[in-house]
Each structure stands twice: as structure tokens, then as C-alpha cells.
Amino acid sequence: MKICIDARWIFPEISGIGTYTREILSQLTKLDSRNEYLVLFDNVSVRKRIWHETGAESSENFSAVTLDYGVFSVSGQFKLPFLLKKQSVDIYHSPNYMIPFLAFPRNRPGRTRCIVT
């Protein structure tokens, strides 16, 4: 199964959602080697730091994409659904209630499922 984790909520400054997301990544690198993980970032320096801190750099089932749009971007509302489809993502996990509104239509067969925590 391919799971996408939206880590764009990890900002350079310490935040609650960012800490929560970092810990999810850290634990998944230790606990799950069966599923494939695609982790989304929008900041290269944050990506490098988190990749090292969580151990994802040594996990073969983790890959990262640095997007050119942030979580509050209007263009991201349109671009992210295409990325999820192109990457054949089964589950999209957002650690915040803000999700791309076009990415999860109910009537599309084989659609990506969404989890919000």
C-alpha cells in the first residue's frame, strides 16, 4: 500500500502539528517496512533536517517530494490531486483538517482515501 503523509505542516519553527507529524514519521520508520511512504514537504531545509532526524534517510520504503506550493496555496488545491493520482497513492494522511478539496471525490473508482488527524 502506498501512503502519502503531508509533512508540509512541519515548519522551521517548532509547532504542535509539526512535532506530531515528525513523531509519526519517526515511529513509522521503525515500525513499518511493508508499506511504501511518500512524504510531502514544501521546504528543502526542513526536508533535509526531518529526513535525518526521523531515520527516513535509511529507510528504503520512504521517499520524499518537495513541492513548490505550501499548505495554504490555492494552486496546491489543484496540483496536489494530480500528484496523488500520478504517484498511485492509496491513502493520503493530513495532520491538519485542511485538505485539497478536489482530491477525494466519492464517486471515483479506485480513488485515494483520506485520513485527517
Set out the residue ranges of the language-model regions:
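Carbohydrate transferase catalytic cores enriched for Leloir-type hexosyltransferases
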Residues: 1-117
